[in-house]
């Protein structure tokens, strides 16, 4: 999965997919009442990027729905996964469940079209703080109470805080999560970070009793780092330059081993080599 980073304006969906992304990451900020409000990152952000592009969250969802609904004039067949980077650090811990409930309602109405031929992309809810795990339970409860528990088949989870892998496993247990786990590791492109924790995550993914289904690394903008991440065995790479990742995947060393994921590749299944 080539994951376009910080895609917060509707116009950027086309831009990143046309550069080679089959997945995008979108920032979601919340108001004081735990309503998802804007797709917005703010300052500071990655080096070389504009930090301030934004939409109202529900409007972004409508644009995203068009981009992922077959038959729509804006449809992109290859856009198959969306990571919502949930900026919950502005909330109190006890608001996490409410944030999950409100997020589920927004997605149900504006993205899934109340279960009636909505957008088809898989969704990863990425949460920065382990203490906010109740966002997941609130989300799940709401889709169930609104009569659409089947949509949970399209939803996965990630904690983005670079926490100890054992602590993340315990938190999923508390949240009742037993699959659909995308584990991320990384740092802003302005800084360097080694691949030690990525290798630990890959080892967990590939062990018989691991909880991780997919591992992705962020933020990768250079060819050399892309090769290092692929050599470490990641499933996804988040980038500001999807075309760079696509170029490396076309190199003879990687062409035989990797391919771009399509809609038929289940993002919740651990790939067995």
Swiss-Prot record:
The cofactors it requires, by name, are: Mg(2+)
Q: Which residues are glycosylated?
A: 250
Question: Which residues are the active-site ones?
Answer: 5, 41 (nucleophile)
Major location (coarse): secreted
Q: Could you give the cofactor binding note from the entry?
A: Binds 1 Mg(2+) ion per subunit.
Tell me which UniProt keywords the record has, alphabetically. Answer: Cytolysis, Dermonecrotic toxin, Disulfide bond, Glycoprotein, Hemolysis, Lipid degradation, Lipid metabolism, Lyase, Magnesium, Metal-binding, Secreted, Toxin
Family annotation (InterPro entries)? PLC-like_Pdiesterase_TIM-brl
The record lists the catalysed reaction(s) as: an N-(acyl)-sphingosylphosphocholine = an N-(acyl)-sphingosyl-1,3-cyclic phosphate + choline; an N-(acyl)-sphingosylphosphoethanolamine = an N-(acyl)-sphingosyl-1,3-cyclic phosphate + ethanolamine; a 1-acyl-sn-glycero-3-phosphocholine = a 1-acyl-sn-glycero-2,3-cyclic phosphate + choline; a 1-acyl-sn-glycero-3-phosphoethanolamine = a 1-acyl-sn-glycero-2,3-cyclic phosphate + ethanolamine
Q: What is its EC number?
A: 4.6.1.-
Which cysteine pairs are covalently linked by disulfides here?
45-51, 47-190
Provide the free-text tissue specificity comment from this protein's UniProt record: Expressed by the venom gland.
Query: Which terms does the UniProt entry file under GO BP?
Result: killing of cells of another organism; lipid catabolic process
List cellular component terms (GO).
Answer: extracellular region
Q: Which GO terms describe its molecular function?
A: lyase activity; metal ion binding; phosphoric diester hydrolase activity; toxin activity
Q: Does the keyword Thylakoid apply?
A: no
- Compartments in which it is found: Secreted
Q: What does this protein do?
A: Dermonecrotic toxins cleave the phosphodiester linkage between the phosphate and headgroup of certain phospholipids (sphingolipid and lysolipid substrates), forming an alcohol (often choline) and a cyclic phosphate. This toxin acts on sphingomyelin (SM). It may also act on ceramide phosphoethanolamine (CPE), lysophosphatidylcholine (LPC) and lysophosphatidylethanolamine (LPE), but not on lysophosphatidylserine (LPS), and lysophosphatidylglycerol (LPG). It acts by transphosphatidylation, releasing exclusively cyclic phosphate products as second products.
What's this protein's name?
Answer: Dermonecrotic toxin LdSicTox-alphaIB1aiv
């Amino acid at each position: 999965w080539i994951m376009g980073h910080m895609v917060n304006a509707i116009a950027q969906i086309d831009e990143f997919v046309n550069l080679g992304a089959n997945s995008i990451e979108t920032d979601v900020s919340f108001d004081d009442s735990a309503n998802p409000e804007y797709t917005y990152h703010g300052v500071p952000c990655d080096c070389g990027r504009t930090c301030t592009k934004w939409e109202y969250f529900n409007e972004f969802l409508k644009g995203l729905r068009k981009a992922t609904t077959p038959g729509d004039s804006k449809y992109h067949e290859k856009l198959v996964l969306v990571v919502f980077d949930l900026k919950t650090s502005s909330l109190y811990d006890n608001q996490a469940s409410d944030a999950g409930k409100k997020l589920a309602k927004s997605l149900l109405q504006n993205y899934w079209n109340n279960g009636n031929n909505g957008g088809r992309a898989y969704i990863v809810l990425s949460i920065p703080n382990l203490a906010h795990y109740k966002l997941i339970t609130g989300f799940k409860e709401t889709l169930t109470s609104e009569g659409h528990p089947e949509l949970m088949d399209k939803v996965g989870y990630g904690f983005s805080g670079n926490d100890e892998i054992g602590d993340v496993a315990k938190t999923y247990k508390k949240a009742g999560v037993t699959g659909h786990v995308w584990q991320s590791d990384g740092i802003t492109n302005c800084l360097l970070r080694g691949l030690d924790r990525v290798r630990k995550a890959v080892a967990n993914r590939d062990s018989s009793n691991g909880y991780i289904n997919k591992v992705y690394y962020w933020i990768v903008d250079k060819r050399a780092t892309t090769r290092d991440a692929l050599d470490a065995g990641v499933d996804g790479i988040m980038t500001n330059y999807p075309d760079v990742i696509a170029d490396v995947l076309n190199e003879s060393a990687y062409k035989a081993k990797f391919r771009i994921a399509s809609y038929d590749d289940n993002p919740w299944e651990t790939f067995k080599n």
